Amino acid sequence: MPKLLRFDEEARRSLEKGVNKVADAVRITLGPKGRNVVIEKSWGSPTITNDGVSIAKEIELEDKFENLGAQLVKEVASKTNDVAGDGTTTATVLAQSMIREGLKNVAAGSNPILLKRGIDKATEKAAKYIKDKAKKLSGREDIAHVAAISANSSEIGDLIAEAMDKVGEDGVITVEDSKTLETYVEFTEGMQFDRGYISPYFVTDAEKMEVELKEPFILITDKKLSAVKPLIPVLEKVAQTGKPILVIAEDVEGEALTTLVLNKLKGTLSACAVKAPGFGDRRKAMLQDIAILTGGTVISDELGINLEDVAIEDLGRADIVRVKKDDTIIIGGKGNPEEIKKRIAQIKSQIEQTTSEYEKETLQERMAKLAGGVAVIKVGAATETELKEKKHRIEDALSATRAAVEEGIVPGGGVTLIRSRKAVEDVLKELDGDEKVGAMIVYKALEAPIRQIAENAGYDGAVIIEKILASKEESYGFDALKGEYTDMFKAGIIDPAKVTRSALQNAASIAGMLLTTEVLVVEKPEEKKEAAPAMPPEY
């Protein structure tokens, strides 16, 4: 395939044009008065959004050289979104400002490598400033504020705060479509897994077709149970206590199943059998989770424990177990809280190490079940277009809230970025030549988000920046929604520190790469050949 090449200044100008086209489409969405963008879809209704990364992802330019610049900005937005879940528009605005200033200096004869070095040094100091100024979340109200700002809706903020309140920081919160127009939170407490009773004869509530066992003993094994002889000693021990038993095994069949069913029907021993959740190694891990949650032991040949030797202490305990046709819920497991914490920490470190998204989701789900439950935010809307947009905002707000829990919060509205210029001023004193010019590029870019927020709300950015910098209060800023100056923390205008920091670092990374680019290589478009003339009709 033949290639087209473009060099030096011409190459960088093409990249800049592509960057500007994407950034101009994205930056109008910044802040509480940001505008919407309507995106055509090849099928179905168009999407209306003010989410930076969604807009950037949709843009593909006709000019192949310009498109390379557009792809670089997309990279800034999606990388920030992947790491922090929000801040994509801020990252794009910062990147555009750095690239514009940087290219001016390269055209004037500055050394791009030294400029990049200056940009990196200034960014490092500003990012450290942001991290140091972060304040830990102090409760439900802070969580609601962070989520409300990300989603641009206090109603969504309250929903996310309610969900986090119920499941804790490590809990799983999922977003699903609601069957009504309402948006609400549904909560499932305890550990739930998708395996139901093996036989309907175990049912204790015929109306609901479910089994409810109060304060049961729980036998957990990875074996297939078919013979009854190995089971008899443990069943006799449980029968003497007068409590019910739940058997979780690879499978229960034949004599073993018949014995459990007959004991249940005769009223000798209330029992229920379910298959173990998952497959292969995942099954082993989930059985171990259940054992730790309930304070039991997994009866396994690998551990050298035989069913005949099982003591009552090897069985798990819980307050209530509910078993339906397709799922089982264990509520109030009696496991050692310290052991449960250790297991959660172990799963957390596995999440950090894994690169597979599917694996990550599965591990998070396991962690949530150990932590005590799953919250589902059911999203309702009048039209499909509104539903898609609302769902997307909630998912974004959830990610931003998790980022805030992780690294803390800083004053929002671009205030922290402009205040971080103090840290860059210290770097400027140490540098000279083109490195100093590079640091100055970052210094100027740090005011771009606040300027854009003001302009989107119909105010003069320069006037607002001057007024904010005149105040010594670090959290003093401009509330663009109400059009007044205020303490950002008190007004609840806060951003997760991780979002602000990631936006700056990703913008600087792409700007540095673009400034040091000398050559562009793209595929030459194929020339469309004229179609052959139609055959003359036959007579």
Swiss-Prot record:
One of its GO terms (cellular component) is cytoplasm. It holds the Pfam family Cpn60_TCP1. Forms a cylinder of 14 subunits composed of two heptameric rings stacked back-to-back. Interacts with the co-chaperonin GroES. It comes from the Bacteria. The keyword Transferase does not apply. Together with its co-chaperonin GroES, plays an essential role in assisting protein folding. The GroEL-GroES system forms a nano-cage that allows encapsulation of the non-native substrate proteins and provides a physical environment optimized to promote and accelerate protein folding. Belongs to the chaperonin (HSP60) family. InterPro entries: Chaperonin_Cpn60_CS, Cpn60/GroEL, Cpn60/GroEL/TCP-1, GroEL-like_apical_dom_sf, GROEL-like_equatorial_sf, TCP-1-like_intermed_sf. ATP binds at residues 29-32, 86-90, 413, 479-481, 495. GO terms for molecular function: ATP binding; ATP-dependent protein folding chaperone; isomerase activity; unfolded protein binding. Keywords: ATP-binding, Chaperone, Cytoplasm, Isomerase, Nucleotide-binding. It catalyses: ATP + H2O + a folded polypeptide = ADP + phosphate + an unfolded polypeptide. Its EC number is 5.6.1.7. This is Chaperonin GroEL. The keyword DNA-binding does not apply. It is an enzyme of class 5 (isomerase).
